[in-house]
A protein has these predicted regions:
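A ligand-binding cleft/hinge motif common to bilobed small-molecule-binding domains
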Residues: 171-196
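Acidic, Gly/Pro-rich loop/turn segments at junctions of secondary structure
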Residues: 57, 66-164
Length: 255
């Protein structure tokens, strides 16, 4: 009860701040501090590169970015914007979709030259696997579609040669020929285009999609400093090629 009251009180105070900012905006450009929460890899590769242009356009802004792979309480922790994976239901938040992230199984040409490219999911039993462990302790499962349309699941953690938590580290390990890893297309894109990674089992692999969203507190008045930041981030992320690669465009990168 007390936490709920404090959360509602914070929303009310922030609405008051927004009203003050709106009045000020009638006389001046957007200015002030904007606090953003985002995950480490996505924030570094996609959010951070979008900020110089924003700051160049609005020099009165001060952007504070926290890189955190945990799910934060945007209202309680005082964030203006969160860029994160998964649509977390919360009546106090507005959710704007950014993209749907796809994943692929990859290995380096050197690894494939030494061990061969698996032609069926069952053949993975003879290969070196790199697994990802989430902060919750769970290991990411690999899903495959059989000829009859059924879905089979492989737990790479049972026999992984290497288990990592940071998604970008799986890409690096695959590039270093440690083994086969499931990674986000947006993380592997440059390596696929350069030829340093190849996609395997593309016709069988069924990774599903992971939705990236921008969320911000639901309020009647949104401060101009937050409005311009939201607009800029949505436009920048919509134009980010790596985040919108269609799956049928990946066939040319298959082993």
């Amino acid at each position: 009860m007390r936490l709920s009251f404090l959360r509602q009180a914070r929303v009310a105070l922030e609405a008051l701040d927004a009203a003050v900012d709106t009045v000020a905006a009638q006389r001046a450009v957007a200015s002030g501090r904007v606090r953003i929460s985002t995950s480490s890899a996505f924030g570094r590769d996609h959010v951070l590169p979008a900020l110089p242009a924003l700051l160049g356009r609005y020099p009165g802004l001060s952007i504070e970015v926290d890189f955190d792979d945990r799910v934060v309480d945007i209202v309680r922790d005082g964030y203006d914007i969160a860029v994160r994976g998964g649509n977390i239901p919360d009546s106090a938040l507005v959710t704007r979709p950014v993209c749907r992230l796809n994943a692929v199984l990859v290995a380096s040409p050197e690894y494939l030259a030494m061990h061969g490219a698996p032609q069926t999911p069952e053949a993975l039993q003879a290969h070196r696997l790199i697994a990802r462990r989430f902060l919750t302790g769970q290991v990411s499962q690999w899903n495959f579609k059989a000829e009859d349309g059924s879905i089979t699941t492989l737990d790479p953690g049972n026999r992984a040669m290497l288990t990592l938590s940071a998604p970008e580290s799986l890409v690096q390990a695959a590039c270093d020929s440690v083994g086969i890893a499931e990674v986000g297309v947006h993380l592997a894109w440059d390596h696929l285009r350069s030829g340093s990674l190849k996609i395997i089992l593309h016709d069988f692999h069924q990774p599903g999609t992971y939705e990236m969203v921008i969320q911000y507190p639901h309020r009647a008045l949104i401060a101009p400093r937050v409005q311009v930041t939201l607009k800029h981030l949505l436009e920048a992320l919509a134009a980010d090629e790596k985040l919108h690669v269609p799956m049928d465009a990946l066939d040319v990168y298959a082993a």
